[in-house]
Structures are given as C-alpha cells and as structure tokens.
Amino acid sequence: LQEYLKSLGSVAVAFSSGVDSTFLLKAAYDALGDKVIALTARSCSFPERELQEAINFTKDLHVPHEIFDSEELKNKEFSENPANRCYICKREIFSKMKEIADKMGMKEVIEGSNIDDLGDYRPGLAAIEELGIKSPLRYAGLAKNEIRELSKDLGLETWDKQSFACLASRIPYGQRITEEKLKMVDEAEQLLLSMGFRQVRVRHHENLARIEINESQFPLIMKKETRELIYNRCREIGFIYVSLDLLGYRTGSMNETLDV
C-alpha cells in the first residue's frame, strides 16, 4: 500500500471520516507527507457529526482539508431515487473532487473502497472507475477486518467505528429523496445512538420507521420504557408507525428488493 501511494506522487483523498477513508488518509500522509490533501462533500445526506469528525481528524493530522457543497438533491435524476442512485451521486461528487484536485496541483484522487465492497450491489464503484479515481485499499487487497486491525495498530480511534452509509440509503428505491426525509432519518438515528445502540439504521418507509440494530442489543430495545421512549420520539420526528426489523442490522438491506 505504501509503495503504491508513493508511486502516485501527490493525492487528494476522498474523506468521509469512516474507517476506510480515515485509514487511507493516514497511510497517504505517512507515504507522501505534504503532498496530500483531504476532500469532503458537505450534504444533507451526510450527518453533521460525521463532518465534524472529518474536520477534527484533518486538523490533528495537519492535512489541508477542502470542504465543498454537493447538491445532489437538486439533481432530479438522483432525487427520484433509482436503483443506480449511488452511481449518479458518486459521479457528481468525484467529478467535483477531480476539479478541486487539479486546481490544487494534486495528480490523483483516491478513495477508500476495499475488497469486501465488491461483494454487494455497489453502482457507485462504476462511477469511480469511469472517472479514473484510484482505489489503493482494493489495489492492496485489503479487507475490512484487516483495515480495522491496521487502524488499531496505528492508534486510530476509528478502528472500531461502526459502518456508516449515506442517509439516502435509508429510503427505498423509487421513493423520492427529500431533505425532510433525510432529516427525519438523521434525528431518529441520533436518538438511538444517544441511547447506547451502536450500529443503527432507520429505514424510511413513508410514515413507517423500520429500525435495524444488532441482534445482541434486542434485549435493550425490548424493555418497555425503551420502546415507549423510541416510539414517542419517532412520532415527534414525524413517523406514525415504528417497527423493529426482526433480522436486525445488515448491510444493504434495501438491495434485497433488487434482482442483481
């Protein structure tokens, strides 16, 4: 990984503050020093807490950090929420990143997908490849568990951070994505996180919230006072019905409706 990064000369790292991109930014900084910048897209699909973590990490690492506004909701092609939504969004965001990187004299834009990402429906990867974005972690053959282990060795706090996907992934394909829906999802997930649930997804099915949490935490959510608090708060947020997914949290559950 280090040798490959050095061969790129200078890089702009697509940085979301997640496990993979944090490790990649640290590895790039170790390999290239001041020939690295971080780029983060600010969007209503990206919670403020994640943006703040990105800002804090780049400050600690002393890496220049450019934050730009992505306006995917203004793109009707995206907001109508087709099955290739991720492709549309990634194409727009990474096109902007390439423009910024070019203006700042960076030779390549790199991003943090790993080899495990090849096993799910990931239309966003097509946009990355079309635009010539480099994926060093995939090039090095690194899987998620290895990235976590290496992050721990490097002393990165994100080594055990829970996986996160953009808030738009909580809305079923074909149902329009709106700022209001994204805000409802964000508020409901913030509630669950504040109550001690570690891995959470609140899927937005119009007036119904479908909650996914790790099965190990089912006993906590089944307590009467916990259920009542979640129900009442979700009603205040705007949902009418609140349900628990009996299979628990799983990556890409919205893709279960697709024939891929």
Regions found by a protein language model. Give the residues of each.
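Mid-to-C-terminal catalytic subdomains of enzymes
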Residues: 111, 138-144, 148-192, 196-201
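Alpha-helix N-cap and loop-to-helix initiation/capping positions
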Residues: 85, 177-180, 222-225
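A short, acidic, flexible beta-alpha connecting loop/helix-capping segment that sits on the rim
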Residues: 245-252
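ATP-dependent adenylation/nucleotidyltransferase module used to activate substrates
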Residues: 1-153, 194, 209, 225-239, ...
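A short interface-forming secondary-structure element
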Residues: 204-206, 210-223
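Short, low-order "capping/linker" segments at domain edges
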Residues: 252-260
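C-terminal boundary motif of the adenylate-forming
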Residues: 198-205, 245
